[in-house]
């Protein structure tokens, strides 16, 4: 069991910023197309964080051309170049699934001070 924990700690990334559900983040994700590799930024609101250790994931939601798009990223993935926290949101829930039903101004999140 100790061997597994030591291997997992070796793989954990320590360069990631602290963020919570409700925060607006920009995730720079490496996309591999054939033999080319490029970095694709994805900006949106974190609606959920789950898990711990290497299996931790987070889901980012954004509205693109009027359609809500959600993408789940593994937190410690080597394909994540970096994560920028754009603004901190003030919410009282850990899972923000209610944002799926809201549109326009109702879907805004107050900024945390």
From Swiss-Prot:
It comes from the Bacteria. GO terms for cellular component: cytosolic large ribosomal subunit. Keywords: Ribonucleoprotein, Ribosomal protein. Pfam families: Ribosomal_L19. One of its GO terms (biological process) is translation. One of its GO terms (molecular function) is structural constituent of ribosome. This protein is located at the 30S-50S ribosomal subunit interface and may play a role in the structure and function of the aminoacyl-tRNA binding site. Belongs to the bacterial ribosomal protein bL19 family. This is Large ribosomal subunit protein bL19. It comes from Carboxydothermus hydrogenoformans (strain ATCC BAA-161 / DSM 6008 / Z-2901).
């Amino acid at each position: 069991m100790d061997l597994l924990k030591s291997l997992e700690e070796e793989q954990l990334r320590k360069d990631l910023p602290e963020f919570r559900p409700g925060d607006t983040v920009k995730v720079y994700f490496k996309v591999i197309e054939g033999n080319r590799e490029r970095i694709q930024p994805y900006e949106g609101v974190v609606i959920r964080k789950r898990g711990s250790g290497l299996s931790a994931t987070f889901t980012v939601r954004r509205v693109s051309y009027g359609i809500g798009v959600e993408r789940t990223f593994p937190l410690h993935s080597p394909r994540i170049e970096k994560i920028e926290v754009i603004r901190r949101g003030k919410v009282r829930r850990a899972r923000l699934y209610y944002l799926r039903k809201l549109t326009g101004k109702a879907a805004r999140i107050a900024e945390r001070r």
